[in-house]
């Protein structure tokens, strides 16, 4: 998450959930600039909002597919490097720009973005080169929070092998309160998020409903944006199967910059693919 000063000021003035969204329509880079094969993809959300994504096909035989949900700032052109290694590891990747981000239309809201993720999931599993029963949802920062809530309530739960949340916060109000408390000037205003921040899509309230879908939480021990205790909160509330990796010397969404962590994650993904489709999935959490 960026522009902390803007977040604090907006909260102090009584603004609400939109401060979590810092989109940009600027195209900063493309996978092609780095020799990575990709395809622009366009589709629509249920409410008709036009959405944009990049599809990065696996090199050779695909082990599975990943729906990637980026953080709160800019767009996929500044985040795709976090998953650029996955095609070489055998995974197709669909990287979504939420409404209002990058090439997608509309204005970001939590409710709208949940529709966007649902449309992206449908687009991914409908592709002829994708096994619809081998999908992992991977989100970072805001994307991790979105992923947890989405999968807990998704109509496509039976297609999802695992949820991975890197540097996710546990609760919208909690992280806003903590940011206000970090600064002496806004410390007295910690009560504001209780009344100004929409918490209907809180990952903390949804995480227990993920099971039996496996949950992997990743958090850098040096994350000063979303402190590691947020992943610990989510881990404590989640049911098995679950795992929490705390990564030394990693900051916010910085764990996957380490080759050892990427290798470990590739091994985790391969293991979840081998586990097969689990039986008795509910169609959605209620």
How does the language model describe each region?
Residues 149-206, 254-259:
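Hydrolase active-site cap/lid region
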Residues 258-286:
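Catalytic active-site module of serine/aspartate enzymes centered on a nucleophile-bearing elbow/loop
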